[in-house]
From Swiss-Prot:
InterPro entries: Cell_div_SepF (IPR023052), Cell_div_SepF/SepF-rel (IPR007561), SepF-like_sf (IPR038594)
Similarity-based family: Belongs to the SepF family.
Gene: sepF
Record's keyword terms, sorted: Cell cycle, Cell division, Cytoplasm, Septation
Species this chain originates from: Streptococcus agalactiae serotype V (strain ATCC BAA-611 / 2603 V/R)
Quaternary structure note: Homodimer. Interacts with FtsZ.
GO cellular component: cytoplasm
Top-rank taxon: Bacteria
Designated name of the protein: Cell division protein SepF
Region described as Disordered: spans on this chain: 27-99
Pfam families per record: SepF
Biased composition (Basic and acidic residues): 27-38, 72-81
Length: 201
């Protein structure tokens, strides 16, 4: 009976749109019935405390179990779930972060044709992307200006700019390490020479 009353209370809590006076009286009657049932269960509990252990075991075996509401139980369960989640989460986050680091490293290949393309290259560095820049479609003077702008931006953003070919440079953010050994770059017929230090000859 008490369980049914609890369900009725829960349902009536959500059904407040069509409240009428009859329902208010019904709720008051239910409340008085609940008080009576609580008093009856309290009397039964006091009677059970006076019985012997064997009689009590027989009575428990013949009646269905009743559960008492513990307001702190939900809080304890929530805390236990949170603790279990926090203990399991660092391991998962570490594995996920390694996967994300492997997946997030991308290299964009850019062939700038005019000086204004340098801003697009720097924007890629800002979002932590590596950029391989090939200046083969630019004139020497424009390429020097563009390279100077990109080099300045990479220093401000703590990136690095490295020469990897006769007209190619690799621009990397601070979190990417590049290990380039001495490379002998063969002359491919392009007579343009781009110097990393931007010295004029």
């Amino acid at each position: 009976m008490a369980l049914k009353d609890r369900f009725d209370k829960i349902i009536s809590y959500f059904d407040t749109d069509d409240v009428s006076e009859n329902e208010v009286h019904e709720v008051q009657e239910r409340t008085s019935v609940q008080r009576d049932s609580r008093a009856a269960t309290a009397q039964e509990a006091s009677q059970r405390s006076h019985m012997t252990n064997s009689a009590e075991e027989e009575m428990i075996g013949s009646r269905p179990r009743t559960y008492t509401y513990d307001p702190n139980r939900q809080e304890r369960q929530r805390v236990q779930r949170d603790n279990a989640y926090q203990q399991a989460t660092p391991r998962v986050q570490n594995k996920d972060s390694v996967r994300q680091q492997r997946e997030q490293v991308t290299i964009a290949l850019k062939y700038p044709r005019k000086y204004e393309d340098a801003q697009e290259i720097v924007d890629l560095l800002i979002v932590n992307e590596c950029v391989l820049i090939d200046f083969q479609y630019m004139l020497d003077a424009q390429a020097r200006r563009c390279l100077d702008y990109i080099d300045g931006a990479s220093r401000v953003l703590y990136g690095s700019l490295q020469k990897v070919g006769s007209s190619m440079f690799l621009l990397t953010p601070a979190n990417v390490m590049v290990d380039i050994e001495e490379m002998n770059i063969p002359k491919t017929g392009q007579e343009t020479s781009f110097d990393f230090d931007m010295k004029r000859r």
